[in-house]
Amino acid sequence: IVTETQLLRMLSNTPLQIQVEFLQTASYKSTHTDANHLKQFYHTFDQIKDRRYDGMIITGAPLDYVPCEETLYWDEVCKIMEWTKTHVHCTFHLCWGAYAGLYYHYGIEKLDMPKKLFGIYSHEIRKETSPLFRGFNDHFLAPHSRATDVRLSDVEAIPNLEVMAVTETGSLAIAKTRDSRQFFVTCHAEYDRETLALEYERDMKKGLTSVDLPVTEPSS
């Protein structure tokens, strides 16, 4: 529900009138969201597969060290991602969704990081003239919370993909297709002020040792 609320808050900043629908997997039932909430507000893919949408957000999941094919609902996610190519004008792949999308559509493998990239980082814009960055400076700040990465060279090797922004550590932050119908975003512009602190507490309770305190003073 937290991610749902954060994304709705971001979408509400647009002057456009947006009608939002929520989608859940049928092959896996979430253990972190109240079942009654899902039943009341969420659809399954079979319920919406004949509709067409202007946009879709495929969100993240705490699956950093799990290979894509070992994700319990991977087959269903693949079916949905394939469907987006004909039924959604623009698809926004966020965090784990970005790595899932890059792997499914372009065969780009996600890599495990020895230490979680966790905190607020500076980003270099590679495509300054893009409408995506209208009003931005050459660098911008955004949170990251992930132990997964891709080789930037693997993304750059795909003719249909453009690297739009990278982190101060040289990691992919934003990429898109040349027709702007697919976006792949590894940072979290939707996060609230306390989200990183809450995620740190969650990771500590899990006994994770590869997580340091979140970075709050970017190096650039």
Residue ranges of each PLM-predicted region?
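Short catalytic/ligand-binding loop motif for oxyanion handling, primarily in non-cytosolic enzymes
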Residues: S30, D64-P67, A100-Y103, R151-S153, ...
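Extended catalytic core of nucleotide-activated donor transferases of GT-like folds
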Residues: Y42-K49, V66-L72
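N-terminal beta-loop-helix "entrance" segment that forms/cooperates
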Residues: A26-K39
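Cysteine-nucleophile active-site neighborhood
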Residues: I58-K127
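Amide-donor transfer/coupling interface in amidating biosynthetic enzymes
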Residues: I1-S27, H43, I48, R52, ...
